[in-house]
């Protein structure tokens, strides 16, 4: 009858567990389990091997490590000391830690090892020459495997070795269990795949930086003269060719003198020099409308008029033209 009640409770637990969507494995999970243990007792105790039903509850400190409280009851076990069959009763409670291997999840196998301590109490036991109630403190070691039917329902099979610290005797057991777990995080979730970065927009082609080209003209004159000397024709021709290449350009031809002589005279002399250079440009193909000839007299010296060398530099016609390179 007790076995039927145990099975009924186990089946009810499974149905309840599968009805809670929040149940899971992993850190923070609580496991509840019903198990049945086959106990192989040390021969010195004169106790037949028996079957012990029990229950266990565990809490996962991490995804792999759980702390467990277990309780099982010794039923239907008898002495075999030759003095008559005596019914043996008692129980065992224990605190153990289980370390699991493998990944939690549906249809997964998780081997485990465990260790801890327990307390065992049995009545009508003859052990090492005495009888009565036997109390033992146990060191427990075990191993096994869990199979998870779902994230919440599992079956367990394992073996345990119990060492009695009081008398140095060993007992062994094999067990099977059926359990459920509640809560937890089902292990570390796989990180969501990093979305592919959006393609960089194709940069608009940069407008090419306009390159400025420039040509300059510097024609020198003899004292009190306005005649363009032959050695300057090439420079004037370069300016004319540049303006032909860039037909949108115009030019100012600026005439200058040194400081010798009256201002009014030098003003007229500088204008004549500018006009002469304009005439050469026109001969080289530049339209007159694109040329402005201006005389500045002695007002814009670029060198010292106190020396002959400086005055020679100041007797000049200047021009410069800029354009954007094609």
UniProtKB/Swiss-Prot annotation:
<dbReference type="InterPro" id="IPR008722">
    <property type="entry name" value="OprF_membrane_N"/>
</dbReference>
<feature type="signal peptide">
    <location>
        <begin position="1"/>
        <end position="24"/>
    </location>
</feature>
<comment type="function">
    <text>Known to stabilize the outer membrane.</text>
</comment>
<keyword id="KW-1134">Transmembrane beta strand</keyword>
<dbReference type="GO" id="GO:0015288">
    <property type="term" value="F:porin activity"/>
</dbReference>
<feature type="repeat" description="4">
    <location>
        <begin position="196"/>
        <end position="197"/>
    </location>
</feature>
<keyword id="KW-0998">Cell outer membrane</keyword>
<keyword id="KW-0406">Ion transport</keyword>
<feature type="repeat" description="1">
    <location>
        <begin position="190"/>
        <end position="191"/>
    </location>
</feature>
<feature type="repeat" description="7">
    <location>
        <begin position="202"/>
        <end position="203"/>
    </location>
</feature>
<feature type="repeat" description="3">
    <location>
        <begin position="194"/>
        <end position="195"/>
    </location>
</feature>
<keyword id="KW-0626">Porin</keyword>
<keyword id="KW-0732">Signal</keyword>
<feature type="repeat" description="6">
    <location>
        <begin position="200"/>
        <end position="201"/>
    </location>
</feature>
<feature type="repeat" description="5">
    <location>
        <begin position="198"/>
        <end position="199"/>
    </location>
</feature>
<feature type="repeat" description="8">
    <location>
        <begin position="204"/>
        <end position="205"/>
    </location>
</feature>
<dbReference type="InterPro" id="IPR036737">
    <property type="entry name" value="OmpA-like_sf"/>
</dbReference>
<dbReference type="GO" id="GO:0006811">
    <property type="term" value="P:monoatomic ion transport"/>
</dbReference>
<dbReference type="Pfam" id="PF00691">
    <property type="entry name" value="OmpA"/>
</dbReference>
<dbReference type="InterPro" id="IPR006664">
    <property type="entry name" value="OMP_bac"/>
</dbReference>
<dbReference type="GO" id="GO:0009279">
    <property type="term" value="C:cell outer membrane"/>
</dbReference>
<dbReference type="InterPro" id="IPR006690">
    <property type="entry name" value="OMPA-like_CS"/>
</dbReference>
<keyword id="KW-0812">Transmembrane</keyword>
<protein>
    <recommendedName>
        <fullName>Outer membrane porin F</fullName>
    </recommendedName>
</protein>
<dbReference type="InterPro" id="IPR050330">
    <property type="entry name" value="Bact_OuterMem_StrucFunc"/>
</dbReference>
<comment type="similarity">
    <text>Belongs to the outer membrane OOP (TC 1.B.6) superfamily.</text>
</comment>
<dbReference type="InterPro" id="IPR006665">
    <property type="entry name" value="OmpA-like"/>
</dbReference>
<keyword id="KW-0813">Transport</keyword>
<dbReference type="Pfam" id="PF05736">
    <property type="entry name" value="OprF"/>
</dbReference>
<dbReference type="GO" id="GO:0046930">
    <property type="term" value="C:pore complex"/>
</dbReference>
<dbReference type="InterPro" id="IPR011250">
    <property type="entry name" value="OMP/PagP_b-brl"/>
</dbReference>
<feature type="domain" description="OmpA-like">
    <location>
        <begin position="208"/>
        <end position="325"/>
    </location>
</feature>
<keyword id="KW-0677">Repeat</keyword>
<feature type="repeat" description="2">
    <location>
        <begin position="192"/>
        <end position="193"/>
    </location>
</feature>
<keyword id="KW-0472">Membrane</keyword>
<feature type="region of interest" description="8 X 2 AA tandem repeats of X-P">
    <location>
        <begin position="190"/>
        <end position="205"/>
    </location>
</feature>
């Amino acid at each position: 009858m007790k076995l039927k009640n145990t099975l009924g409770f186990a089946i009810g637990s499974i149905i309840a567990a599968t009805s809670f969507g929040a149940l899971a494995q992993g850190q923070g999970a609580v496991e509840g389990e019903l198990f049945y243990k086959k106990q192989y007792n040390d021969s010195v105790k004169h106790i037949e091997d028996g079957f012990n039903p029990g229950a266990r509850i565990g809490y996962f400190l991490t995804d792999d490590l759980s702390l467990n409280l277990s309780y099982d009851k010794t039923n239907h076990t008898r002495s075999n000391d030759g003095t008559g069959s005596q019914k043996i009763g008692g129980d065992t409670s224990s605190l153990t830690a289980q370390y699991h291997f493998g990944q939690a999840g549906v249809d997964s196998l998780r081997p485990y090892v465990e260790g801890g301590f327990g307390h065992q109490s049995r009545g009508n036991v003859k052990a090492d020459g005495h009888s009565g109630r036997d109390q033992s403190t146990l060191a427990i070691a075990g191993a096994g495997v869990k199979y998870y039917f779902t994230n919440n329902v599992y079956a367990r099979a394992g073996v345990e070795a119990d060492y009695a610290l009081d008398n140095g005797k060993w007992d062994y057991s094999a067990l099977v269990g059926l359990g459920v777990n509640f809560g937890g995080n089902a292990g570390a979730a796989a990180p969501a795949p990093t979305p592919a970065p959006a393609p960089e927009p194709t940069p608009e082609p940069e407008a090419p930086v306009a390159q400025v080209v420039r040509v300059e003209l510097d024609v020198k004159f003899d004292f009190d003269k306005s005649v363009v000397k032959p050695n300057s024709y090439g420079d004037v021709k370069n300016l004319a060719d540049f303006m032909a290449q860039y037909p949108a350009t115009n030019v100012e031809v600026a005439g200058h003198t040194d400081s010798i002589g009256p201002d009014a005279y030098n003003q007229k002399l500088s204008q004549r020099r500018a006009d002469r250079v304009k005439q050469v440009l026109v001969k080289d193909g530049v339209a007159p409308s694109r040329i402005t000839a201006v005389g500045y007299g002695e007002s814009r010296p670029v060198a010292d008029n106190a020396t002959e060398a400086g005055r020679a530099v100041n007797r000049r016609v200047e021009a410069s033209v800029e354009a954007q390179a094609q």
